[in-house]
């Protein structure tokens, strides 16, 4: 068989080119911007213009009052997840996620000293198994990691699912005397078909950190640009970006390339 009949499911590398507007913007930057600043270090919290633009886009799209202080640029969604988990957990904490899940969640969580626990799947819908979730949401859990649209199932978590999940998180947080953070991994948010819409998890639960990447939506996986968006009203909203900035420095994962943020 020819290569056109071979499908590689080992890596989510887009098979369509990036938008021509991106290429044109890069060419303009290289031709017109002063090279020293264009290729120099950006602030440890990221390029202010990029952060402001992302906040404005999220506010316009989802109706939540994001500001620059809520946005932390990262090297794709992978960097976003790793930083978000480190910011809201301590060694010995537990993190819940739902099967099936992106395999790298395991090392991301292990790197923080926390323990990943996996909620069993709910076939055939593969919406989160909320009965099992409620039972597994013990006092040790400080973070829940979700992925919608899901990799590998493609399932979009419904508004009903997110409403019920938020109610469970709110109830358990009150019971245990500490807020449980929701880290929402959303690199496929813009890639849906058949008229489907993707409910925004942060709209359902206040203590949410959204992790996004332009790798899939703009076909730019090699450029490594994403962000963490701390929901307005989230516990620690005024310090979480500072925390992730320090985590980035001390783990050697500084901000994405300056030119990509521009």
Please identify what each model-predicted range represents.
Residues 110-117:
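A short helix-loop-beta submotif of the ANL/AMP-binding
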Residues 66-71, 91-94, 140, 178-179, ...:
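Short acidic capping loops at alpha-helix termini that bridge into adjacent secondary structure
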Residues 33, 61-63, 168-179, 232-237:
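Alpha-helix termini
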Residues 87-109:
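Conserved PLP-anchoring active-site segment centered on the Schiff-base-forming lysine
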Residues 206-262:
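Conserved core segment of the aminotransferase class I/II
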Residues 123-196:
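Active-site phosphate-binding strand-loop segment of PLP-dependent enzymes
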Residues 1-76, 83:
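N-terminal small-domain helix-loop-helix segment of the aminotransferase-like
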């Amino acid at each position: 068989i020819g290569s056109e009949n071979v499908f590689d499911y080992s890596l989510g590398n887009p098979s369509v080119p990036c938008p021509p507007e991106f290429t044109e913007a890069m060419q303009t930057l290289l031709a017109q911007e002063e090279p020293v600043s264009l290729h120099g270090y950006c602030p440890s919290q990221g390029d202010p213009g990029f952060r402001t633009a992302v906040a404005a886009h999220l506010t316009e799209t989802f109706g939540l009052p994001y500001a620059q202080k809520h946005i932390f640029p990262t090297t794709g969604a992978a960097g976003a997840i790793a930083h978000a988990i480190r910011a809201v957990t301590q060694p010995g904490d537990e993190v819940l996620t739902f099967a099936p899940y992106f395999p790298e969640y395991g090392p991301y969580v292990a790197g923080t000293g926390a323990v990943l626990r996996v909620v069993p799947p709910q076939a055939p819908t593969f919406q989160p198994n909320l009965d099992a979730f409620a039972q597994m949401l013990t006092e040790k859990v400080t973070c829940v990691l979700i992925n919608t649209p899901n990799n590998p199932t493609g399932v979009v978590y419904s508004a009903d699912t997110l409403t019920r999940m938020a109610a469970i998180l709110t109830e358990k947080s009150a019971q245990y005397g500490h807020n449980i953070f929701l880290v929402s991994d959303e690199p496929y948010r813009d890639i849906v078909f058949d008229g489907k819409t993707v409910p925004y998890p942060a709209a359902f639960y206040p203590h949410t950190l959204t992790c996004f990447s332009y790798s899939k939506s703009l076909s730019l996986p090699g450029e490594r640009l994403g962000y963490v968006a701390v929901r307005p009203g989230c516990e620690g909203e005024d310090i979480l970006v500072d925390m992730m900035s320090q985590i980035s420095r001390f783990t050697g994962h500084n901000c994405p390339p300056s030119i990509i943020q521009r």
